[in-house]
């Protein structure tokens, strides 16, 4: 495949991810406070709302990954994004608490966008370039996160809390059109047919327990992904509440909405810097395991800063360290997982990886409200501790990783 073709496909899928993330991040600073102010939801119920989304995504993640292997990346990406459009519209017009939960569950069930985007990138990228290329997804995330949360906070403050949901729905609809008209399918009809024929023997959770030589390293990677995500789940489900209770205590709703959005934009700027500049340079100097250690250590520092500070200016440093650490650690960990399986199983293993992440987020977001009720900084101390555990776990993993891929692509 010509490099020019790869570059064009890569740019197109990254544009899709950017627009998608722009829309999704619009609601990030708004939804918890919207639920609290409009529906009188407690912190425990608000974090359960977040948990419901990830529970649905956890159940559908491997299935979506296999669907993309069997029927192509583009059709699955389009269908999943249509579900997101519908869910955002439902959020804007939800008449009751039950409709809020239904909308988030629907988005979770159809929310296989990122799994498919990751599989798409691994399709068009040589093994030795996957850490860098997967990093570009997080760069697109970061770019979307620069504008999305700030714009969401501004729209909510200026026009009301439902407007960000409608704008997010428009952005998601734009992704559907962009995918339909601009994105090329990476799997040929023959490859999709072979994938369907191999379903009975395809990569599943059961195969991880069957004693295959690659099972232990992959299980350890999934466990590390679980632990690494735990801190993020605690943060993302409580950050708006934390901002209102601690960082912007005593400020008006408008100042709080805009301020939380701007702090989340710091996360986006940090992610963009990490993926477009920092990670590529670090990847030339350190191996994938070392990158995960470095990133997890920075994540620990970021969560500790959140637990200690009481002003938004100092909170920005927590956002900086956490986002840079997350950006350094995540792409190489995903790359390590795909290096263990055959080319035909990449979609499936990325689905498993995402399900491990989502399972962690289900648990962390479900208990985050209870922890927050005990004290607004408690979730951040717990997040710092789990990030530190990842550092030790990845050091142990390096002893079990093969020096070359365990499963090779079939000729």
Map each language-model feature to its residues.
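Cytoplasmic helix-loop-helix junction between adjacent transmembrane helices
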Residues: 103-142
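Residue-level signature of mid-helix packing/kink "hotspots" within the transmembrane helices
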Residues: 54-62, 112, 145-146, 268-276, ...
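Short amphipathic helix-loop junctions that connect adjacent transmembrane helices
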Residues: 30-43, 238-258
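Helix-to-loop junctions at the C-terminal end of transmembrane segments
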Residues: 61-72, 273-287, 372
């Amino acid at each position: 495949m010509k490099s020019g073709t790869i570059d064009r496909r890569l740019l197109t899928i990254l544009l899709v991810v950017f627009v998608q993330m722009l829309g999704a991040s619009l609601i990030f600073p708004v939804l918890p406070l919207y639920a609290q102010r409009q529906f009188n939801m407690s912190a425990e119920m608000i974090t359960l709302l977040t948990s419901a989304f990830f529970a649905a995504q956890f159940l559908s993640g491997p299935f979506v990954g296999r669907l993309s292997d069997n029927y192509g990346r583009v059709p699955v990406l389009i269908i999943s994004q249509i579900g997101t459009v519908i869910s955002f519209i439902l959020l804007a017009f939800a008449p009751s608490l039950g409709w809020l939960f239904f909308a988030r569950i629907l988005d979770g069930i159809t929310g296989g966008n990122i799994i498919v985007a990751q599989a798409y990138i691994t399709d068009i990228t040589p093994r030795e370039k996957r850490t860098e290329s997967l990093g570009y997804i997080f760069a697109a995330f970061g770019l979307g996160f620069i504008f999305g949360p700030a714009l969401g906070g501004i729209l909510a403050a200026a026009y009301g809390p439902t407007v960000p949901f409608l704008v997010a729905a428009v952005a998601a609809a734009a992704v559907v059109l962009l995918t339909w008209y601009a994105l090329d399918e990476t799997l040929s009809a023959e490859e999709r047919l072979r994938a369907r024929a191999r379903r009975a023997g395809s990569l599943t959770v059961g195969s991880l327990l069957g004693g295959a030589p690659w099972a232990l390293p992959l299980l350890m990677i999934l466990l590390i992904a679980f632990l690494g995500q735990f801190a993020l789940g605690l943060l993302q489900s409580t950050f708006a509440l934390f901002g209102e209770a601690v960082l912007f205590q005593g400020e008006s709703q408008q100042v709080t909405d805009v301020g939380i959005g701007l702090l989340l934009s710091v996360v986006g700027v940090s992610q963009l810097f990490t993926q477009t500049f920092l990670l590529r340079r670090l990847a030339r100097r350190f191996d994938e395991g070392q990158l995960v250690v470095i990133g997890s250590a920075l994540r620990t520092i970021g969560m500790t800063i959140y637990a200690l500070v009481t002003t938004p200016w100092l909170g920005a440093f927590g956002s900086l360290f956490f986002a840079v650490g997350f950006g350094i650690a995540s792409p190489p960990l995903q790359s390590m997982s795909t290096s263990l399986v055959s080319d035909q199983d990449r979609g499936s293993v990325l689905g498993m990886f995402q399900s491990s992440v989502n399972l962690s987020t289900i648990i962390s977001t479900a208990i985050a409200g209870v922890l927050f009720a005990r004290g607004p900084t408690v979730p951040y101390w717990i997040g710092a501790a789990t990030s530190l555990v990842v550092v030790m776990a990845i050091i142990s993993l390096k002893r079990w990783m093969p020096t070359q891929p365990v499963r090779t692509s079939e000729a």
